[in-house]
């Protein structure tokens, strides 16, 4: 390499270094846990997380994401499939007119409104548990296999009372 080529190389390297140092890195997308669904069938768990935008607020395009943690296998993350999203673990979510929270409904619990919102450094999934406002933490589904598709015997919701901080739970049987 002659002096001219070496000079060009040095110039290119210093330009690359300067641009990479001065160009701000895009912040990584941040997710905060909302609640989980556990099942009696196996140890796999569905996680629902709040997705935050760059400004730290709930992402208006996709405020909530859901995925499996395959604990019965090796603990890897796996997306919900189409059938799971449509019939069991999917959800709808839309912004409230006030702009303070999002309405979320699980496809398996259409009549139970969940309010998702930012509360300081954490996010909340607030719903009624046993008739009282509570922060939802976990849903447990007791099910049995009939042929191929699991059939739920009951669903139990667990959370913390918004006012008192006391544990709350409610058992719901399908069709009731």
Give residue spans per PLM region.
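Bacterial N-terminal signal peptides that target proteins for export
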Residues: 2-11
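Bacterial N-terminal signal peptides
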Residues: 12-20
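N-terminal export/targeting and maturation segments
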Residues: 24-82
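Short, ordered beta-strand-loop transition motifs
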Residues: 39-42, 95-99, 109, 147-152
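Mature extracytoplasmic domains of secretory-pathway proteins
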Residues: 64-135
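Beta-sandwich interaction modules
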Residues: 140-144
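Short, exposed beta-strand-loop hairpins at the edges of beta-sheets
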Residues: 146-170
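Short, solvent-exposed mixed-charge patches
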Residues: 175-176
């Amino acid at each position: 390499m002659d002096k001219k080529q070496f000079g060009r190389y040095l110039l290119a390297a210093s330009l690359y270094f300067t641009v990479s140092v001065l160009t701000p890195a895009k912040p990584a997308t941040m997710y905060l846990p909302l609640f989980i669904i556990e099942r009696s069938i196996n140890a796999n768990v569905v996680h629902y997380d709040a997705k935050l935008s760059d400004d730290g607020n709930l992402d208006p395009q996709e405020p909530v994401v859901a995925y499996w943690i395959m604990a019965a296998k090796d603990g890897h993350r796996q997306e919900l499939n189409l059938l799971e999203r449509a019939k069991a673990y999917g959800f709808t979510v839309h912004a409230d007119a006030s702009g303070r929270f999002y309405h979320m409904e699980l496809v398996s619990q259409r009549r139970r409104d969940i309010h998702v919102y930012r509360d300081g450094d954490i996010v909340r999934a607030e719903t009624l548990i046993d008739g009282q406002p509570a922060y939802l933490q976990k849903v447990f589904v007791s099910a049995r296999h009939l042929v191929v598709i699991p059939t739920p015997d009951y669903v139990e919701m667990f959370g913390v009372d918004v006012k008192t901080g006391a544990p709350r739970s409610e058992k719901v049987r399908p069709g009731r």
